[in-house]
Amino acid sequence: MANPTGNQPVSYPIFTVRWLAVHTLAVPTVFFIGAIAAMQFIQR
């Protein structure tokens, strides 16, 4: 992350592959945690 030329990201696209990898893992994880937490409060 130490870039001597300034704050221009030169060699890596920040939000293409990394953004997709984080969100394809994070979005279903948050959804299932919310669904499991909601199921704890459902009485039969």
From Swiss-Prot:
Q: Which cofactor does it need?
A: heme b
* Gene Ontology MF annotations: electron transfer activity; heme binding; iron ion binding
Question: What family does the database annotate?
Answer: Belongs to the PsbE/PsbF family.
For this protein, the record's PROSITE patterns field holds: CYTOCHROME_B559
Query: Main location per UniProt?
Result: membrane
Superkingdom, taxonomy of origin: Bacteria
| Chain positions recorded as heme binding sites | H23
Q: How does it sit in the membrane?
A: Single-pass membrane protein
Please name the Pfam families in this protein's record: Cytochrom_B559
What's the record's note on cofactor binding? With its partner (PsbE) binds heme. PSII binds additional chlorophylls, carotenoids and specific lipids.
Q: What is this protein called?
A: Cytochrome b559 subunit beta
| Membrane-spanning ranges | 19-35
Which UniProt keywords are present, listed alphabetically? Electron transport, Heme, Iron, Membrane, Metal-binding, Photosynthesis, Photosystem II, Thylakoid, Transmembrane, Transmembrane helix, Transport
Asked whether the keyword Electron transport is assigned, the reply is: yes
Q: Which organism is it from?
A: Gloeothece citriformis (strain PCC 7424) (Cyanothece sp. (strain PCC 7424))
